[in-house]
């Protein structure tokens, strides 16, 4: 109980400080998106969170708005990303709105990464139920592994076969090791990664 309360207070304070501290990046992101492709600033993705409950995860929008089933809407997602969208994805600005999820309690700073419905359907039984006992996180040990190995693989099928299973195992491991000091250690590790190579994909 002490850990849960401490973690929630820590998450709320960090998210609030994070939003204030990164406010210039929010302004740049909002203006850049509106200039690139007029429409909603935020993109909401349905993800599975704690106790296998769905929630809306926020991101800055990086793809063009599709209003009808035109030829453009049938293109692969990669073709719909506008140039500024590529930039905010590369430097991770698109992830900043997830600080709002941390404020409202649907996410934490450190924890298993939230998964999409199709991924949840693949891993919903067994160990996944263990990972679902804690709040999903902005980052965590699986993100660190993905940074080291996942970024080297472009093919999605190869990624799902070689990287994703180990990544899921690390999510389960987090549940067993979860604690305030372990969370702080992960924050230090991930911060060092962002500082040393800020333009690489971390999560």
Regions from the PLM with identified roles:
Residues 15, 43, 82-86, 118, ...:
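Positions in alpha-helical segments
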Residues 1-65, 176-196, 200-201:
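A hydrophobic, helix-centered structural microdomain
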Residues 78, 90-94, 178:
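Soluble non-cytosolic domains of exported or imported proteins
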Residues 84-91, 172-176:
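Short, well-ordered beta-strand elements within core beta-sheets of diverse protein domains
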Residues 43-80, 141-169:
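Short, glycine-rich, amphipathic interfacial segments at transmembrane boundaries or analogous
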Residues 100-196, 200-201:
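Hydrophobic structural segments characteristic of membrane proteins
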Residues 86-108:
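Short, conserved beta-strand/loop elements in beta-sheet-dominated catalytic cores
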Residues 1-5, 76-80, 95:
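Juxtamembrane loop-helix boundary motifs flanking transmembrane segments in multi-pass membrane proteins
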């Amino acid at each position: 109980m002490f850990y849960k309360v401490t973690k929630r207070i820590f998450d709320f304070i960090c998210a609030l400080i994070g939003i204030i501290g990164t406010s210039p990046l929010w302004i740049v992101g909002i203006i850049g998106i509106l200039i690139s492709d007029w429409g909603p600033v935020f993109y909401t993705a349905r993800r599975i969170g704690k106790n296998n409950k769905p929630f809306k995860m926020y991101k800055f929008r990086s793809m063009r708005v599709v209003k009808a089933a035109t030829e453009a809407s049938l293109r692969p997602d990669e073709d719909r990303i506008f140039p500024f969208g590529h930039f905010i994805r590369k430097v991770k600005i698109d992830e900043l709105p997830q600080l709002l999820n941390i404020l409202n309690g649907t996410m934490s700073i450190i924890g298993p990464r939230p998964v999409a419905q199709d991924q949840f359907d693949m891993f919903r039984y067994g160990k996944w139920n263990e990972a679902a006992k804690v709040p999903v996180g902005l980052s965590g040990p699986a993100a660190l592994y993905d940074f080291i190995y996942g970024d080297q693989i472009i093919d999605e099928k190869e990624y799902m076969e070689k990287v994703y299973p180990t990544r899921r195992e690390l999510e389960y491991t987090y549940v067993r090791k979860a604690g305030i000091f372990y969370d702080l250690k992960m924050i230090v590790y991930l911060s060092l990664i962002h500082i040393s190579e800020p333009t690489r994909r971390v999560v």
